[in-house]
């Protein structure tokens, strides 16, 4: 509003408010004009009388907009007589009742004087200024001025007309209306005031009447409620009366029964008295008879008669006594029942009284209602009286008006008044003249204004058009605004992200500032150094001049060298040819020398140890400190503990355990580097902390002296110059590494001839490729114009001799030098400089390029696999009978290797070099497989033993990277001459991963290498962090071997599942029969003691085992071909049965059948300790090797990783089946071995069940974790082969399939079948029956076979998800399990037999009966199931074999994880069948014996231990994640012994306690309990033990119920209600603490540390509880010591403490009070609560509790309709039993009873709303939350908490809560909320403090969003 108008309105505010009468009309017009908002109108309506007008004017003055015109228009329409007050600030009385009424004086008195008139007229628009208008006026001002003038003109015209009338009346003496003017009578004013008062009273009475009507309606409603309540109470009372009558009738009946019983009792008593009398009579008769006749016979007869009668009476008496006792018992029961009924009657009487009281209360309320109705009638009567009085007052007012008319007529008669009128007339004339003059001025001004109005109208039209355009622009701007709003939302999110980034950047800034300070210090030091450098610069300049002259000379020499390049190439080719010839000539001599040295080395093991130092090299590594506060993480490596926790058993050195890729240490340090010194600090016998201290204390650079394995292969950097001659493409394809992937034929690179596929490219045109990506390298190749200079890294295998450089290497070196000289010194120097620039470490013993191989590559050069080994080429391998190699394979290319070859999983090199580290891969396109095919290397390195050597050579290569070999032809194993003892035992060649402790007594035909074994304390890989001892008992079974002439020491020591797989002091090596996979590249794999195998495992390989499972001398170098990683599954060490096919076995042979074949008995050693007295055990023997310990630190690999073992050893091992080492049918012809990996689904199709090559069940299991590689095929020669032949044939074997999940048979089924059937010798083959009762019976995700188990299913409303069928011999079986169903989640499997269902026996039920039983509706289902898949399978799948192993009935489904029998070949993989005639009965029996022994070993067994001490002496590992395993058994333990526990045993039961899902701490506590003897059920499962060993074995989540502040660094601090993830309950064997992770809101791990265990905290609570009891007993007389008050807790809540010192001391003990820790209930832990993680993908329902629920829900739905939706209640007309049954069946959540129906909340409606992506607002009672939890629905429960009922009453909202909450209603809601909070607070997700409704809704929205994004934790089973 303009200031002038605001001032004018403020001046006349009071007078205008007093004069305004029709306020309601004015308000209506103002509201219609938009001057008043609805809220202001409601505010004005609340006011009454004159205050309303005054408030209206105040509101108008307070508004910013100008509503003055609206007020003027409203007054003009309703009360025009008030306009002078508005404009002239005058005081005008009420309007006259008629025109011309009133005296002339009163009219004229209201008119202003001349001065006032002029001033008031001139003040319109401009107050206090001249009347002339301003020169420039706006359109709005002009319009307002025109309107004001027109109003004033109308007023003046009206006044003029009235004055004319008065003037005429004064002149003529009469008025125009014939009525004289009279002054108002004072009584009229008084009556008018009384009338106004009466009208106000009438209005108040109307308001009271309205309120009374409302109250009456409320009372009527309450009356209806109480009527219904009364009727309900009456019905209850009637029912209770009926009950009482019924009870009375029952009481009367009982009384009648009591009377009858009492009467019968009296009859019985009377009969008893009669019987007594009769007995007395009989006695009297007897005495008389005795007196008269003393004959004994008569007496005896009488006596007998009496006794008979007595017996009859006694029986009757007993029957009656029994009946009497029963009646008495019935009577007592009736009495007790009568008493109960009496008590019930009393209770019902009390209830009736209560109901009567309630009825009386209702009657009182009814009386009150009647009184209120009477009161209402009285008020109505009073209202009628007031109306009558009002009519009387109106009649009196009319009389007064008539009297007023008479008074006016008398007034005219007075002469004095006429004189006055004349005088007044003169004054009026003068004023009229003045007004007319002013009117002329106004008219002139109006003319001017008219012209201005026309201009304004034209402007208005233009402004209208502009307004339309502006509206269009506004609409566009509105759209832009919407988009901007959306962008603003996105921007807010981005701002939040940027805020977080800003925080991180701030932190980085702080660190950068700190680093800047450090940099300043360094800068000062740099300035000092710069001065020194400046001084040295001058001297360097002179040196630079000299170097420049030398460079010019070198450039000229380079030009000369390039000119002679062609001649040099020709010379190179000639020298290469000569070199090949020299190689072939020197090989035989070198092999003889090597073999001689090897045999000489056998006499002393010390020689191997002395040469150990030749495998090591010392290197100085330097790091540049970037900052002062550097740590291991910044350097990018980690180290082992050292002395405190040795990385390897017996070796306390500090080793590098991890090197981060891309870090500072990458390329400088390697895994398993031995740190000798750091910054001149000796680290011998130091621990990790001291090493870190030495690392951090250094200033400037960090110098490390490390010791590592030498890389003994020769590596050469060969420069290559390619002349592109205008061609754009060089023809070279690269792959990650950087390696040459392919060379395009005819390209410039192919024409040069020196570049081969697999060569590593170190530099391009002098630019090092060390840190360049593949794209950058390719761009460098493309950027070359005319010429291309490459630096190639070629790796050549070193000779197997340890005696220095031999002739072959000298020739090779000469070849290198030729290559270097051909390319000139400048390129070499340039490449060398580039290499040095990218590697700061200084190596002392090897060439620069050795470090290039250490860099990790992203993948192998030959394929897309990300694993660090190369696939073997796809070409087949053939074995040729030639004894000498051809020259075609002796080229450098056959020895060529690429740098990626040194990055295997820690493989042991074939040539006796150091084991290849994990970040090295084997060099060469063929990897180890190809390199091992070279005679000079593979034969030399793998020689030893007495096996007849196979002289190997190569044939033509049909395709790239394919090698063919054939072994030497040998006699058939069926030749009877082979059973004769040869004079000279043939040599056996072994390729084991470690040096054997025993040696061959005869020299080999070729010289083998003299590679010493590696130190027994080193390991070169961190891929597998478990340690393995190599000795323990063996469960191997070997049946059908030849007469043993070898010592037990010839047996291959394998990873014994009985030993703990963790670091332990080195023990003497113990050997056993096993065929296991040794860790690749494990440092200890090269020196395992005497790993001599008697079998070959066909389950995972038919080729590579040849390179691993051979006996060889202890000093022979170990060989480990690259294999696919498979964790050792000792569970699948399955002993097989092998029986000879004919009766040629001598008794001696049968006697040695269980033992391993070997060499002559003169090499045997005494056994280390006696083995188990059972068939199939192998005697232990002490090997000649020194004490060693095998440390398993690598994954285990199978042949399917595309590495073919060296064929230098007999290839017969490739075909040795797991059942024996006999020649199988499949090996009689040329077969094809498919070594490709297959998926799990493929495995089921590759199950071989044919003849003697049938695999064990564990060998046929598919594994989803196996690696996928390219398929390769290996040709098997037709020559019958066998792994070893010492004296005669060895056909017995043990198969220990050792893969994480048993692999498939690599043999093709079709090929095997056709070949086996086509062989004529098939009938002579022994039948191999596989023992099906292996540990393979239980897969990781499968239950134990034939072991009943309880399965609990929380069914709810969902289907079970299984299909059932009836067995052939009865029983109900699960034929299908739907994946993801609740049955699948609960653990039901295909093949489960359902024994019981909720306690109902189904063992003999039919399928129809079972379906009826299973179809019953219930919340929780308990099923007793037994895993018997074979019982159902045997009846539905036929077998094609003529003979089945009887143990085959125990076979299990060992498929690839399918739960339905979709693959018939998978149904019974353990059933074996014969292709030829069946085995003779004698042979069958022996195989059954072996199978039974095998079954006894691998099935769960029961161990009885007599506990003579507190501890069993058993070390445990694992936990509830994988199971609790026996890690170690102490020597003095009662569990030690042949029938005791062995490491690797999985504890299934301890006593009567099932420990399958127990933590290791719980099992440990159970073992500590005092017992005389204990029964354990265990199962030997080494493969899972290998996984569980060394890793945390427990896994569960807990909620902390107290606060804890860590005192030590290793401990974990947490707060109450924090979620912790416990992964180790017995860390390092320490009881009393747990290792746990602290989790954030998203269940992500934050920090790991140590926390007190549950048992420790329970003891703490018990102690405190006892202390508090002592406090209560002693009250204030005692105070507890400070030690008793110590705890792990920190007080979170403030307790009310008393003022006394004793009270303060005692209250400090209340840390377990109810506000912080729950109370004791059913042995629940007070410290921790076990919880379960639930991922809520759908939106969770919302349940709001507290006062004003409906209003809040309505507001949420209206304000956020896309987020919330109320759950609709379904109206159901059904019986209450049906509704409750629906609740029980989880169909309904809750229901409310209405009149005649039920309002039901269903689960389907909740899910329907959830599926719409909305939160469902539930309307259920709090007790239904538990039902929702059972249905796996977890609502967000929000409680609205108000401080008092007054706050509830004060809540108002203009839209959602218009009516004020009454006092009673608010009090009831508050009390109900308090009760609800007290009873159900444990379910509350959050509590919101009550306030304004909008604030509550905002808080609910925020809380719902927060809780929806949180991870949900629900209570699980108690700890």
From Swiss-Prot:
SH3 domain segment(s): 1593-1661
Low complexity: compositionally biased ranges: 109-123, 1252-1264, 1284-1298
Stretches assigned to coiled coil: 383-599
Limits of the Guanylate kinase-like domain: 1722-1905
Primary location class: other
Compositionally biased intervals (Pro residues): 1045-1055
Gene expressing this chain: DLG5
Compositional bias annotation for Basic and acidic residues: 1017-1030
GO BP, sorted A to Z: apical protein localization; cell-cell adhesion; epithelial to mesenchymal transition; epithelial tube branching involved in lung morphogenesis; establishment or maintenance of epithelial cell apical/basal polarity; glial cell differentiation; intracellular signal transduction; maintenance of cell polarity
Bilayer topology term: Peripheral membrane protein
Function of the molecule: Acts as a regulator of the Hippo signaling pathway. Negatively regulates the Hippo signaling pathway by mediating the interaction of MARK3 with STK3/4, bringing them together to promote MARK3-dependent hyperphosphorylation and inactivation of STK3 kinase activity toward LATS1. Positively regulates the Hippo signaling pathway by mediating the interaction of SCRIB with STK4/MST1 and LATS1 which is important for the activation of the Hippo signaling pathway.
Keywords linked to the UniProt accession: Cell junction, Cell membrane, Cell projection, Coiled coil, Cytoplasm, Cytoskeleton, Disease variant, Membrane, Phosphoprotein, Repeat, SH3 domain, Synapse
Region annotated Disordered, chain positions: 98-142, 927-1122, 1150-1187, 1201-1230, 1245-1264, 1271-1306, 1434-1493
Effect noted on mutating residue 1072 to C: Found in a patient with steroid-resistant nephrotic syndrome; uncertain significance
Family stated for the protein in its record: Belongs to the MAGUK family.
Tissue-specificity statement: Highly expressed in normal breast tissues and low-grade breast cancer tissues (at protein level). Highly expressed in the placenta and prostate. Expressed at a lower level in the thyroid, spinal cord, trachea, adrenal gland, skeletal muscle, pancreas, heart, brain, liver and kidney. A short splice product shows more limited expression, being absent from at least the brain.
Residues recorded with modification Phosphoserine: 264, 295, 900, 1000, 1021, 1209, 1263, 1334, 1666
Residues that bear Phosphothreonine: 984, 1011, 1183
Single Gene Ontology MF annotation: cytoskeletal protein binding
Outcome (variant: residue 249 to W): Found in a patient with congenital heart disease and congenital anomalies of kidney and urinary tract; uncertain significance
UniProt biased composition (Polar residues): 1449-1462
Record text about domains: The guanylate kinase-like domain interacts with the SH3 domain.
Subunit structure: Interacts with MPP1. Interacts with CTNNB1 and with the third SH3 domain of SORBS3 to form a ternary complex. Interacts (via coiled-coil domain) with MARK3. Interacts (via PDZ domain 3) with STK3/MST2 and STK4/MST1. Interacts with SCRIB. Interacts with CTNB1, SMO and (via PDZ4 or guanylate kinase-like domain) with KIF7.
Name of the protein in its database record: Disks large homolog 5
UniProt xrefs under Gene3D superfamilies: 2.30.42.10, Death Domain, Fas (1.10.533.10), P-loop containing nucleotide triphosphate hydrolases (3.40.50.300), SH3 Domains (2.30.30.40)
């Amino acid at each position: 509003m303009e200031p002038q108008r605001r001032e004018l309105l403020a001046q006349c505010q009071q007078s205008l408010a007093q004069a305004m009468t029709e306020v309601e009309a004015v308000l209506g017009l103002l509201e219609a004009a938009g001057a008043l908002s609805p809220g202001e109108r409601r505010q004005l309506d609340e006011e009454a009388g004159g205050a309303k007008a005054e408030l209206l004017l105040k509101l108008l003055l307070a508004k910013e907009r100008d509503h003055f015109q609206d007020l003027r228009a409203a007054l003009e329409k309703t009360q025009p007589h008030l306009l002078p007050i508005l404009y002239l600030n005058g005081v005008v009385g009420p309007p006259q009742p008629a025109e011309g009424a009133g005296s002339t004086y009163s009219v004229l008195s209201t008119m202003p004087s001349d001065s006032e008139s002029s001033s008031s007229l001139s003040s319109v628009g401009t107050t206090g200024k001249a009347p002339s208008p301003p020169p420039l006026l706006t359109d709005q001002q002009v319009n307002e001025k025109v309107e004001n003038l027109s109003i004033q003109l109308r007023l003046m015209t009206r006044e003029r007309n009235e004055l004319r009338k008065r003037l005429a009346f004064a002149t003529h003496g009469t008025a125009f209306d014939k009525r004289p003017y009279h002054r108002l009578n004072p009584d009229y004013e008084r009556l008018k005031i009384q009338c106004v008062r009466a009208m106000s009273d009438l209005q108040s009475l109307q308001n009271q009447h309205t309120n009374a009507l409302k109250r009456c309606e409320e009372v009527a409603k309450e009356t209806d409620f109480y009527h219904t309540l009364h009727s309900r109470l009456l019905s209850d009372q009637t029912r209770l009366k009926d009950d009482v009558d019924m009870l009375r009738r029952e009481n009367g009946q009982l009384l009648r029964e009591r009377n009858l019983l009492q009467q019968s009792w009296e009859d019985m008593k009377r009969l008893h008295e009669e019987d007594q009398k009769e007995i007395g009579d009989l006695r009297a008769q007897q005495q008389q008879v005795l007196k008269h006749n003393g004959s004994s016979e008569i007496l005896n007869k009488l006596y007998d008669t009496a006794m008979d009668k007595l017996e009859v009476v006694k029986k009757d008496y007993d029957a009656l006594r029994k009946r009497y006792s029963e009646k008495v018992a019935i009577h007592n029961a009736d009495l007790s029942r009568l008493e109960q009924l009496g008590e019930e009657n009393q209770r019902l009487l009390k209830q009736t009284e209560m109901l009567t009281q309630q009825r009386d209360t209702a009657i009182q309320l009814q009386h009150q209602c009647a009184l209120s109705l009477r009161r209402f009638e009285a008020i109505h009567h009073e209202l009628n009286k007031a109306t009558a009085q009002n009519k009387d007052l109106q009649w009196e007012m009319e009389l007064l008006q008539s009297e007023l008319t008479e008074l006016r007529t008398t007034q005219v008669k007075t002469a004095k008044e006429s004189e006055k009128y004349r005088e007044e007339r003169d004054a009026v004339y003068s004023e009229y003249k003045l007004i007319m003059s002013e009117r002329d001025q106004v008219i002139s001004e109006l003319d001017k204004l008219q012209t201005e109005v026309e201009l304004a109208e034209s402007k208005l039209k233009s402004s209208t058009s502009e307004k339309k355009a502006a509206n269009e622009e506004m609409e566009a701007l509105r759209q832009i605004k919407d988009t901007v709003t959306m962008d603003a939302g996105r921007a807010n999110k981005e701002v939040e992200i940027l805020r977080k980034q800003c925080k991180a950047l701030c932190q980085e800034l702080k660190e950068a500032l700190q680093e800047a300070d450090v940099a300043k210090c360094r800068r000062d030091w740099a300035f000092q150094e710069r001065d020194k450098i400046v001084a040295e610069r001058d001297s360097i300049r002179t040196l630079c001049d000299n170097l420049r002259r030398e460079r010019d000379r070198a450039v000229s020499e380079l030009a000369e060298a390039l000119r002679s390049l062609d001649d040099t190439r020709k010379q190179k080719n000639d020298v290469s040819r000569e070199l090949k010839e020299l190689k072939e000539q020197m090989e035989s001599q070198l092999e003889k020398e090597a073999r001689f040295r090897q045999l000489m080395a056998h006499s002393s093991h010390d020689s191997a140890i002395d040469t150990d130092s030749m495998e090591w090299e010392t290197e100085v590594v330097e790091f540049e400190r970037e900052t002062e506060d550097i740590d291991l993480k910044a350097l990018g490596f980690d180290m082992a503990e050292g002395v405190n926790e040795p990385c390897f058993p017996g070796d306390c050195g500090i080793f590098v355990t991890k090197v981060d890729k891309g870090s500072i240490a990458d390329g400088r340090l390697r895994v398993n580097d031995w740190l000798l010194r750091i910054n001149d600090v000796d680290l011998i016998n130091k621990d990790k902390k001291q090493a870190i201290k030495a690392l951090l204390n250094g200033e400037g650079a960090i110098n490390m002296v490390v010791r590592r394995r030498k890389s003994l292969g020769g590596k050469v950097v060969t420069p290559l110059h390619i002349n592109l001659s205008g061609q754009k493409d060089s023809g070279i394809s690269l792959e990650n590494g950087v390696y040459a992937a392919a060379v395009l034929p005819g390209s410039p690179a192919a024409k040069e001839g020196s570049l081969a596929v697999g060569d590593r490219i170190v530099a391009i045109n002098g630019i090092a490729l060390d840190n360049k990506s593949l794209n950058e390298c390719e761009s460098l190749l493309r950027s070359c114009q005319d010429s291309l200079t490459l630096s190639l890294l070629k790796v050549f295998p070193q000779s197997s001799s340890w005696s220095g450089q031999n002739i072959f290497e000298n020739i090779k070196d000469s070849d290198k030098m030729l290559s270097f000289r051909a390319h000139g010194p400048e390129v070499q120097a340039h490449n060398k400089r580039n290499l040095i620039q990218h590697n700061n470490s200084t190596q002392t013993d090897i060439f620069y390029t050795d470090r290039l191989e250490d860099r990790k590559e992203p993948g192998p050069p030959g394929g897309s696999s990300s694993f660090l080994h190369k696939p073997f080429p796809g070409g087949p391998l053939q074995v040729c009978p030639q004894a000498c190699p051809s020259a075609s394979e002796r080229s450098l290319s056959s020895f060529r290797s690429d740098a990626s070859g040194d990055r295997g999983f820690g493989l042991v090199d074939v040539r006796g070099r150091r084991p290849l580290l994990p970040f090295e891969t084997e060099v060469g396109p063929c990897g180890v497989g190809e390199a091992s095919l070279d005679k000079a290397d593979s034969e030399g390195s793998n020689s030893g033993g007495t096996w007849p050597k196979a002289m190997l050579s190569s044939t033509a290569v049909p395709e790239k990277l394919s090698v063919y070999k054939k072994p030497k032809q040998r006699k058939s194993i069926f030749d009877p001459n082979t059973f004769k003892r040869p004079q000279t035992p043939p040599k056996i060649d072994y390729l084991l991963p470690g040096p054997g402790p025993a040696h061959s007594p005869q020299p080999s035909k070729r010289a083998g290498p003299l590679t010493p074994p590696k130190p027994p304390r080193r390991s070169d890989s961190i891929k597998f962090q478990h340690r393995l001892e190599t000795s323990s008992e063996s469960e191997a079974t070997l049946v059908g071997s030849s007469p043993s002439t070898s010592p037990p020491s010839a047996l291959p020591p394998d990873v014994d599942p009985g030993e703990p797989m963790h670091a332990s002091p080195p023990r003497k090596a113990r050997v056993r029969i096993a065929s296991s996979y040794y860790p690749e590249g494990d440092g200890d794999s090269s020196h395992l003691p005497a790993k001599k195998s008697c079998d070959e495992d066909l389950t995972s390989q038919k080729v590579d085992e040849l390179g691993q499972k051979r006996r060889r001398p202890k000093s022979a170098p170990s060989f480990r071909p690259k294999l696919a990683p498979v964790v050792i599954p000792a569970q699948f060490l399955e002993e097989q049965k092998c029986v000879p096919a004919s009766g040629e076995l001598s008794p001696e042979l049968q006697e040695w059948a269980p033992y391993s074949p070997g060499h002559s008995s003169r090499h045997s050693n005494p056994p280390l300790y006696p083995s188990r007295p059972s068939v199939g055990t192998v005697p232990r023997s002490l090997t000649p090797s020194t004490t060693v310990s095998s440390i398993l630190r690598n994954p285990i690999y199978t042949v399917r990783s595309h590495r073919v073992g060296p064929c230098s050893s007999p290839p017969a091992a490739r075909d040795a089946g797991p059942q024996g080492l006999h020649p199988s049918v499949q090996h009689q012809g040329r077969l094809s071995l498919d070594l490709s990996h297959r998926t799990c689904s493929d495995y089921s199709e590759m199950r071989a069940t044919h003849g003697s090559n049938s695999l064990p069940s564990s060998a046929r299991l598919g594994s989803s974790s196996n690696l996928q590689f390219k398929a390769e095929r290996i040709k098997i020669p037709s020559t019958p082969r066998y792994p070893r032949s010492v004296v005669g044939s060895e056909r017995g074997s043990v198969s220990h399939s050792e893969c994480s999940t048993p692999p498939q048979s690599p043999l093709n089924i079709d090929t095997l079948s056709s070949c086996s059937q086509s062989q004529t010798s098939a009938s002579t083959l022994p039948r191999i029956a596989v023992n099906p009762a292996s540990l393979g019976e239980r897969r990781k995700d499968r239950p134990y076979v034939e072991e009943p188990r309880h399965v609990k299913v929380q069914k709810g409303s969902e289907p079970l998800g299984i299909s059932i069928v009836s067995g052939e011999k009865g029983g109900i079986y699960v034929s299908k399990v739907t994946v993801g169903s609740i049955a699948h989640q609960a653990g039901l499997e295909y093949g489960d037999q359902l024994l019981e269902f909720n306690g109902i026996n189904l063992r003999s039920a039919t399928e129809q009966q079972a379906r009826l039983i299973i179809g019953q509706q219930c919340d929780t289902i308990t099923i007793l199931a037994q895993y018997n898949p074979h019982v159902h399978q045997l009846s539905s799948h036929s077998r094609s074999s003529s003979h089945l192993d009887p143990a085959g009935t125990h076979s299990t489904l060992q498929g690839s994880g399918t739960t339905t029998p979709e693959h018939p070949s998978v149904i019974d993989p353990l059933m074996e069948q014969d292709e030829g005639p069946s085995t003779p009965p004698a042979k069958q029996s022996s195989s059954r014996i072996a199978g039974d022994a095998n079954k006894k070993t691998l099935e769960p067994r029961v161990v009885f231990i007599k506990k003579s001490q507190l501890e069993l002496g058993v070390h445990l590992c694992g936990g509830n994640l994988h199971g609790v395993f026996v890690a170690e058994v102490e020597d003095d333990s009662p569990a030690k012994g042949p029938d005791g526990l062995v490491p690797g045993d999985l504890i299934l039961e301890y006593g009567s306690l099932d420990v399958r899902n127990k933590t290791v701490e719980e099992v440990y506590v159970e073992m500590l309990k005092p017992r005389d003897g204990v029964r354990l059920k265990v199962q030997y499962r080494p493969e899972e033990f290998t996984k569980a060993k060394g890793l945390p074995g427990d896994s569960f989540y807990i909620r902390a119920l107290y606060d804890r502040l860590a005192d030590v660094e290793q401990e974990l601090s947490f707060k109450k209600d924090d979620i912790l993830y416990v992964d180790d309950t017995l860390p390092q064997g320490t009881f009393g603490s747990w290792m746990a992770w602290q989790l954030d809101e998203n269940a992500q791990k934050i920090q790991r540390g140590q926390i007190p265990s549950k048992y420790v905290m329970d003891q703490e609570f018990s102690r405190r509880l006892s202390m508090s009891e002592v406090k209560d007993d002693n009250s204030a007389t005692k105070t507890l010591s400070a030690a008793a008050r110590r705890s792990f807790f920190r007080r979170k809540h403030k307790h009310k403490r008393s003022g006394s010192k004793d009270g303060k001391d005692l209250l400090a003990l209340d840390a377990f009070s109810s506000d912080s820790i729950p109370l004791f209930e059913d042995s629940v832990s007070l410290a921790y609560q076990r919880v379960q993680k639930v991922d809520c993908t759908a939106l969770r329902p919302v349940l709001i509790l507290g006062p004003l629920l409906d209003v809040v829900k309505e507001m949420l739905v209206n304000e956020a309709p896309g987020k919330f939706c109320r759950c609709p209640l379904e109206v159901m007309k059904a019986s209450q039993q049906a509704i409750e049954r629906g609740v029980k069946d989880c169909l309904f959540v809750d229901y409310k009873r209405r009149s005649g129906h039920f309002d039901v909340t269903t689960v389907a409606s909740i899910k329907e709303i959830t599926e719409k992506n909305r939160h469902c607002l539930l309307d259920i009672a709090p007790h239904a939350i538990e039902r929702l939890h059972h249905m796996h629905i977890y609502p967000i429960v929000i409680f609205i908490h108000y401080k008092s009922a007054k706050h509830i009453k004060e809540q108002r909202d203009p839209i959602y809560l218009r009516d004020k909450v009454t006092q009673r209603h608010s009090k009831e809601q508050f009390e109900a909320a308090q009760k609800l909070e007290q009873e159900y607070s444990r379910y509350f997700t959050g509590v919101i403090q009550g306030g304004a409704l909008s604030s509550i809704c905002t808080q609910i929205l925020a809380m719902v969003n927060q809780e929806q994004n949180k991870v949900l934790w629900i209570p699980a089973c108690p700890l």
